[in-house]
Amino acid sequence: MLESKLKAPVFTATTQGDHYGEFVLEPLERGFGVTLGNPLRRILLSSIPGTAVTSVYIEDVLHEFSTIPGVKEDVVEIILNLKELVVRFLDPKMASTTLILRAEGPKEVRAGDFTPSADVEIMNPDLHIATLEEGGKLYMEVRVDRGVGYVPAERHGIKDRINAIPVDAIFSPVRRVAFQVEDTRLGQRTDLDKLTLRIWTDGSVTPLEALNQAVAILKEHLNYFANPEASLLPTPEVSKGEKRESAEEDLDLPLEELGLSTRVLHSLKEEGIESVRALLALNLKDLRNIPGIGERSLEEIRQALAKKGFTLKE
C-alpha cells in the first residue's frame, strides 16, 4: 500500500455547464495524475451510454439514394442531418422511442418540428433537417435507441418498419476529453501532481454526470482484482470464428476508441481518416507524410493498434 502523508485530494469543478466542464483534482502523489487521467479519458470516450438515431422511415422513399419531390435535400443529406440529432430520454429505463415528423412546404424543417413527447427531450431543436418548397411534404418516423459506442448500420440492422433505412449510430454523448497534469505544491513539497480534466458533451448528459459514470465504471472493473476467487475461475476458450468476428467489428471502430492523444487524432481526422479500417489501409510512408505525424506519433499509433491486435503496414 502506498504510504502517504497527504490529506485527501480536493476535487473542484472550476467550470460546470451542460456541454462543457473543467474539473481539478489535487494534490496527488507524483505519477497519479496520468494514472487516473488516462483511464478516465478512455472510459469517457468509449463507454458512457447515450442515444442515437438508428433507423429512419420516410414516406414514399425506398432507399437512401432517393430524392423527394418538393424537398431540396436528398435522402442522404437528410439522414446526415438526423445523425446530428441529440435526444435525451427522461426515463432512465427507456431503451428506445420513435419520433414522428409531419411537415408541409414552404418551410425549413428543424428538429423542434418533431411531434412533442413527454418521454424525450430534443436538446438541439434548431438543428436543420430539410427545406420544403411550395407543395413539398415530408413524413418521417425516426427511431432513437440507447446504446454504447459505435454501431454500424449493418450490425444493428433494425427493421421494425418496412422500408426503414438503418443508420450508423454513435451513441457516446461525450464529444471530446482532454486531461492535463501539472506540478503543484503543498507546504514544502513540490513533487506533487495536479490533474485537470476537460470534458465536452452533446448536452444529453452534463460533463459532471459523464465523469461520475466513468468513475463508477472504473471502480467496478478495478473491483474485479479485489476478488481472490477470480483467479481460480477457468478461462473460457474463444473459437477462431469468434476471434475473426471480433476483429472485424474492431475494424469499424471510430478512431476515438483507440485512445489516441487529441493532437494525433486531430492530424488523422484532418486527412479524412475516421476509422481503424481507414488507418490500417495506410503504410508508414503514408502516415509520415501527414502533417503533425512524427516518429513519436507513429509509436503512439502502433501501440494503440497493438492493443486491438493490429499492426501497421511497413
UniProtKB/Swiss-Prot annotation:
UniProt keyword annotation of rRNA-binding present: no
CDD domains: RNAP_alpha_NTD
Catalytic activity line of the entry: RNA(n) + a ribonucleoside 5'-triphosphate = RNA(n+1) + diphosphate
Pfam families per UniProt: RNA_pol_A_bac, RNA_pol_A_CTD, RNA_pol_L
Region (Alpha N-terminal domain (alpha-NTD)): 1-229
Superkingdom as given in the UniProt entry: Bacteria
Database matches in Gene3D superfamilies: 5' to 3' exonuclease, C-terminal subdomain, DNA-directed RNA polymerase, insert domain, RNA polymerase, RBP11-like subunit
GO annotation, biological process: DNA-templated transcription
Family in the record: Belongs to the RNA polymerase alpha chain family.
Summary of the function given for this chain in its UniProt record: DNA-dependent RNA polymerase catalyzes the transcription of DNA into RNA using the four ribonucleoside triphosphates as substrates.
Protein name: DNA-directed RNA polymerase subunit alpha
Natural source organism: Thermus aquaticus
